[in-house]
């Protein structure tokens, strides 16, 4: 695997912004209200579109809200009424193709995440849904089928997002088994919630307890990773402290995460109090966490000097570097947010292949050569 130097991604903040009423949408008013609440701009705006019910025209109004706000719309594209084999067999092709044409005409970047949380038992495409006939194989094929239609229509402004739920539900579900392949995915993401004690079956869980298993399972997929849905109840613990802890993890052992999208809507009484502003303490913790992540972005160490002609690869868990000429340099390892994970001592390299002695070599990192004069 060749890991060429790439531009690091700044940490991004997004939300399903919620709002008044039972079915609030990301209108400009609701988006602005959430931005006022958190005291900063939203990079990503969440929207949920249902197959056949929400065509591109329904989506476009919110895509334009995002565009006018200087944000990117992230569409959770829900194939309600279809199982995976239905999609593979082309039963939704007309709707998908029309949507693709609309996205192409829109022209701005948009993120689409179809078939999200397929490792659960609650959606028609879920592997764990009893009697639905879904498998890891046909869910992955359904995802590829959707992407292929967009390619046939010449759509180039989509970032494809594959999402796993933080935990499996139902027989046969796996965290990564329905991954459609690197060719069909731009970003990977995780959805997860701390239900606290808002349900008879639930208990308070830390951020790590909710997300660590899925985060580790995605370690071998070499794509940028973000949290597409997240929230915490107030019941059973301290929501503000939970949020603070979440950002601490983003800065340490979850450093691969380049964006987080809060699901800010408290639904029916029998679900969760997911809205960000269930307490002022929770809002303050969110604001402080965002400020912390932005500060890390601004102070991340950048490679010194000028990069030489070099490439990196991983083999059997070891990092190898190939240079085209002799040089004096150190190797710097970054995460996707541009934060330094490790830096080697300065040493002299001859032209050729060199094994780099690093304790943290992995396929999720960015490697650069810092050349010294």
Please identify what each model-predicted range represents.
Residues 16-106, 210, 238-257, 263-287:
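N-terminal carbohydrate-binding/catalytic regions of secreted carbohydrate-active enzymes
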Residues 87-114, 135-153, 177, 250-252:
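An active-site-proximal structural segment forming one wall of the substrate-binding cleft
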Residues 45, 112, 186-188, 260:
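Conserved, mostly hydrophobic/aromatic
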Residues 16, 143, 150-173, 222-236, ...:
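Aromatic-lined carbohydrate-recognition surfaces of secreted/lumenal glycan-active proteins
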Residues 27-30, 166-183, 239-240:
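Distinct, well-ordered alpha-helical segments
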Residues 59-78, 180-236:
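Glycoside hydrolase catalytic-domain groove-lining segments
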